[in-house]
Swiss-Prot record:
Organism, scientific name: Arabidopsis thaliana (Mouse-ear cress)
GO cellular component, one term: nucleus
Conditions for induction: By abscisic acid (ABA), and osmotic stress (e.g. polyethylene glycol PEG). Slight transient repression by salt (NaCl).
Record's compositionally biased regions (Basic and acidic residues): 143-168, 191-202, 209-225, 277-292
Tissues where the protein occurs: Expressed in seedlings, leaves, roots, inflorescences, and siliques. Constitutively expressed in seedlings and roots.
Positions of modified residues (Phosphoserine): 268, 351
Compositionally biased intervals (Low complexity): 37-47, 177-190
The name this protein goes by in its record: RGG repeats nuclear RNA binding protein A
Residue ranges occupied by any FF domain in the UniProt entry: 234-289
UniProt keyword Phosphoprotein present: yes
GO biological process: abscisic acid-activated signaling pathway; cellular response to osmotic stress; cellular response to salt stress; regulation of abscisic acid-activated signaling pathway; regulation of translation; response to abscisic acid; response to osmotic stress; response to salt stress
Length: 355
């Protein structure tokens, strides 16, 4: 008899004891039914000879439980959801619509998703309450497959707005059948050329030999040779021809100038030169006179008629004194009626170094 590990039951502290009791009762019922069925005829179906121990039965039930709604994070926040039997609903996929015969992919999605929705499925595709692990609530009639997006996130650089010309029809490159037909025609043409070219091989060799002979004959022209005397004669003839042309071209017809008359110029060249020289002399004299005219400074220093002569002076040094040369009181400088200084007076303008 096999020995059982008494410590296996320690892992089931979080389980509901009522669920364990129900599981044990089911195992006992299966034992009784197995004993009763062994007595009648052999036509009865065979049941397992040895029932599983309660700890192993609970472990298998836990392993078959769904990952989603019926599993962790159900409505009861426990590991078993509502109840292990109710959570499984007689099927390892939890609250899901049982798949048809042979639908292996669908059952695998349901088992993985728990509530009928596959892992990572989108909303509107799966089973009932509890939802998938990542899918949320979903419908029972969903296929369990990820829907194809209308616009995939792909780079559009280098792509225009035109359609690719892959198909056949007007405005396209053509069908693959046409290319195959063209290739077959080209292969057939090459084969026919080979057949035709193999037969007249001898004729081609003879024709090539004749061509080579003609080419050799054409490449050997005779060089033109002449002596030195002949060359000098040719040069003399060329010189004579050139001299005859030059003498004929240099002849001038004097008959054309006989009808022409000489016109007399009234003004002689000497008179013209004299006038030009006199104009230049006048301009020089005018410049010299302007430079020699002396202008006295008194003309610039004289005030206007009826004006006062201004002599600059210092302003008063009192509080808030006015600017230099302004109107002030006392003996300070201001506007006075004084005569202009005489430049010729030696007292006013003494010469430097004078005695």
């Amino acid at each position: 008899m096999a020995t059982l590990n008494p410590f296996d039951l320690l892992d089931d502290d979080a389980e509901d004891p009522s669920q364990l009791a129900v599981a044990i009762e089911k195992i006992d019922k299966s034992k009784k039914s197995g004993q009763v069925s062994s007595l009648p005829a052999k036509s009865a179906p065979k049941l397992p000879s040895k029932p599983l121990p309660p700890a192993q039965a609970v472990r298998e039930a836990r392993s078959d439980a769904p990952r989603g709604g019926g599993g962790r994070g159900g409505f009861n926040r426990g590991r078993g959801g509502y109840n292990r039997d109710d959570g499984n609903n007689g099927y390892s996929g939890g609250y899901t619509k049982p798949s048809g015969e042979g639908d292996v992919s669908k059952s695998s999605y349901e088992r993985r998703g728990g509530g009928g929705a596959p892992r990572g499925s989108f909303r509107g595709e799966g089973g009932g309450p509890g939802g998938g692990r990542r899918g949320g609530f979903s419908n029972e009639g969903g296929d369990g497959e990820r829907p194809r997006r209308a616009f995939e996130r792909r780079s559009g650089t280098g792509r225009g707005s035109d359609f690719k010309r892959d198909g056949s029809g007007r405005g396209n490159w053509g069908t693959p059948g046409e290319e195959i037909a063209a290739e077959t025609e080209a292969v057939a043409g090459v084969e026919t050329e080979k057949d035709v070219g193999e037969k007249p091989a001898v004729d081609d060799v003879a024709a090539d030999a004749n061509k080579e002979d003609t080419v050799v004959e054409e490449k050997e022209p005779e060089d033109k040779e002449m002596t030195l005397d002949e060359y000098e004669k040719i040069l003399e003839e060329k010189k004579k021809a050139l001299q005859s042309l030059t003498t004929s071209e240099r002849k001038v017809d004097t008959k054309v100038f006989e009808s022409m008359q000489q016109l007399s110029n009234k003004k002689s060249n000497d008179e013209i030169f004299i006038k030009l020289g006199s104009d230049k002399d006048k301009r020089k004299d005018d410049k010299e006179e302007k430079a020699k005219k002396a202008v006295s400074i008194n003309e610039f220093l004289k005030p206007a008629e009826g004006g006062n002569y201004y002599r600059g002076g210092r302003g008063g040094r009192g509080r808030g004194g006015r600017g230099r040369g302004g109107v002030s009181s006392g003996e300070s400088g201001g506007y006075r009626n004084e005569a202009a200084p005489a430049i010729g007076d030696a007292a006013q303008f003494p010469s430097l170094g004078g005695k």
